[in-house]
Design a protein with these regions (language model features):
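Structural motif
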Residues: 170-171
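Beta-strand scaffold of nucleotide-dependent catalytic cores
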Residues: 116, 178-179
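Long, positively charged amphipathic alpha-helical accessory segments at protein N-termini or as interdomain linkers
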Residues: 7, 14, 20-26, 32-37, ...
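N-terminal lobe of the biotin/lipoate ligase/transferase fold
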Residues: 2-141
Length: 237
């Protein structure tokens, strides 16, 4: 049966109005009504709502340089404004988690590298050839869908890749790393996409044993960053 997400959401709105009426709520038949609208269960329905939200909420796409990201992100969160930041840089830099104990900050300072601090326990070395996605949204369940959409877009561009937890891998090698957290009621998603890796600096900065070897997309496939940007923008239109 074809899914009717709009009808299902209208039904859910009625159902939510019965939350204080136990008898009416039990008699409503929420699960049966979901099936009537083409959804096998609540898991499938919630995923469909995520997809509908991502496509129909009018989330704008904005380019931002990593040096301006902290300011632009804080401003958007303070305003409660949803946005997809496409993050670029002019040089090699470091994402450093505030709980990262394996990050060589002495080397970073000695070499004058820009550091973007974030809530986390890892350090990531990025280059000017890379791209990162910074999604701010009020829908707190979107991170897994965004990772899957990104993996699908990369497959459409010729990469044999797949999602594994918070990473996207090709032949077991890590080309994308992501994470999310909630701040002031907004989901903050950060997803780093490596096109070209700087192995020398990764070795010098990241002392944590590597479970998944980082690789650049261009080592597997001649994917153009602009083509991926176009794919990402299409998710929101």
């Amino acid at each position: 049966m074809k899914q009717n997400i709009k009808a299902a959401m209208a039904m859910e709105k009625v159902y939510r109005q019965l939350q204080n009426n136990r008898v009416a709520k039990d008699a409503f038949g929420y699960q049966d009504k979901l099936k009537q609208f083409g959804f096998a269960d609540t898991v499938e329905y919630e995923l469909a709502k995520d997809e509908y939200y991502l496509k129909n909420s009018g989330i704008p796409v904005e380019f931002v340089n990593i040096r301006n990201l902290a300011t632009e992100r804080a401003k958007a969160i303070a305003e409660g404004r949803e946005v997809m930041h496409l993050i670029t840089a002019d040089e090699t830099f470091v994402y450093a988690g505030d709980n990262c104990v394996d990050c060589d900050r002495h080397y970073i300072a000695q070499n004058g590298l820009f550091v973007f601090d974030y809530p986390g326990a890892s350090a990531i070395v990025a280059t000017q050839y890379d791209l990162a996605l910074g999604l701010l949204t009020k829908r707190l369940s979107l991170f897994p869908l965004v990772m899957e959409r990104l993996s699908q877009s990369l497959r459409e561009l010729g990469l044999d890749c797949y999602v594994e937890k918070n990473d996207i891998l090709v032949a077991g090698k890590k080309i994308v790393g992501g994470g999310s957290y909630v701040q002031d009621g907004m989901l903050v998603c950060g997803i780093q996409i490596s096109f070209v890796v700087d192995r020398e600096k990764i070795t010098a900065i990241c002392h944590k044993p590597q479970v998944k070897i980082p690789m650049g997309i261009t080592e597997f496939q001649a994917v153009k960053r602009d083509d991926l940007i176009a794919k990402v923008a299409s998710w929101l239109l």
